[in-house]
């Protein structure tokens, strides 16, 4: 055999061998039923609603290996205004529209959730409940995955539980507005 024939035979043999290694699977357009969380992860969730009761987003908190993976996904487009929105865990698991902060003050939407959550033993800034900013697209949709080691599953469920809050903006006057809230729980 010539040198050229040897190269062709070797190449074809390699292709046949490699094709036997690849799985013949059809692609799927359906979402995966598995989570990105490590095996054995403990999960909490929250359904976020506006003050008028419209569903805005779902959130999951997956705890494994000493940190939480927080995933927030809008459930309906066009409810949240496009742009950056502050997002925090608040200290009380209540999401009541037109309510008063437990420490007093004027009524407002979701004030019953109290202040930003601070884990036991943590006194510094930023508060333990501060999360990454939610960036809402022009169509009103958003999807965020972030991680934190500032709190544990047990921290979020202790005492009065906790709530996840989306604010009207990241900075400025809208940052204080509470526009969506969901109580964090096991189901």
What residues fall within each predicted segment?
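N-terminal leader/targeting pre-sequences
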Residues: 2-84, 89-187
